[in-house]
Amino acid sequence: MLDREGFRPNVGIILLNARNEVFWGKRLREHSWQFPQGGIKYGETPMQAMYRELHEETGLHPEHVKIIGRTRDWLRYEVPDKFIKREVRGHYRGQKQIWFLLRMVGRDCDICLRATDHPEFDAWRWNEYWVPLDAVIEFKRDVYQLALTELSRFLRRPAQRADKPQGPRPSSRYPRVIGTQSQQTLTIVDTSVVCSEIEVEASTLDEMPPRVIVGK
């Protein structure tokens, strides 16, 4: 289903935990990371499509999340010809998306990447809100920046620690790169184990599959 300009209606999902970290999924058998997203079927509202895609890609149900915001209008990106099937070239241009910001009220173990027979992700982690755009496929980066920036107004500020010195806070706007230099410990879900966590170590976000250190 395309609009007159050749864009397919679509929804994107930014899923937050209680610490304002976002669900960050590694695409199946690829080295790129992204948010859950998917097309709106004929007769669906954007909200209905969002809940369907949420379950298909993360295993979560409506009772596991709370909607706290959405973009005011469609955000568009064009797909390069090399990623478009030959039979639809000249008609299909890309995606137009409504983005939803969700707060997870369930538990991490409610997330299951094998909720369907065709999973989108083979690993996931919680990442800082301002995700590293260099881990995202290039033609989606501008839309990610627009969606994150527009929806950031809905974020609640985490409580300030009493012993933390007050002072100017660094800007949280792009450009910003997270976790590309220093070694860090990531928590992902291996889809071979339903709703269980393993601790892994990687020197960069795109070093996948990571080396397993110890099971939790």
Swiss-Prot record:
Known EC number: 3.6.1.-
One Pfam family cited in the UniProt record for this chain: NUDIX
Enzyme's top EC category: hydrolase
Gene Ontology MF: a single term: pyrophosphatase activity
Limits of the Nudix hydrolase domain: 6-149
Top-level taxonomic group: Bacteria
InterPro entries noted in UniProt: Nudix_hydrolase, NUDIX_hydrolase-like_dom_sf, NUDIX_hydrolase_CS, NUDIX_hydrolase_dom, RppH
Listed SUPFAM superfamilies: Nudix
Key words of the record: Hydrolase
Names of required cofactors: a divalent metal cation
Signal peptide (UniProt feature, chain positions): none
PROSITE patterns assigned: NUDIX (PS51462), NUDIX_BOX (PS00893)
UniProt xrefs under CDD domains: NUDIX_Ap4A_hydrolase_plant_like
Motif stretch (Nudix box): 38-59
Family classification: Belongs to the Nudix hydrolase family. RppH subfamily.
HAMAP family: Nudix_RppH (MF_00298)
Function: Accelerates the degradation of transcripts by removing pyrophosphate from the 5'-end of triphosphorylated RNA, leading to a more labile monophosphorylated state that can stimulate subsequent ribonuclease cleavage.
Name of the protein in question: RNA pyrophosphohydrolase
Organism: Burkholderia ambifaria (strain MC40-6)
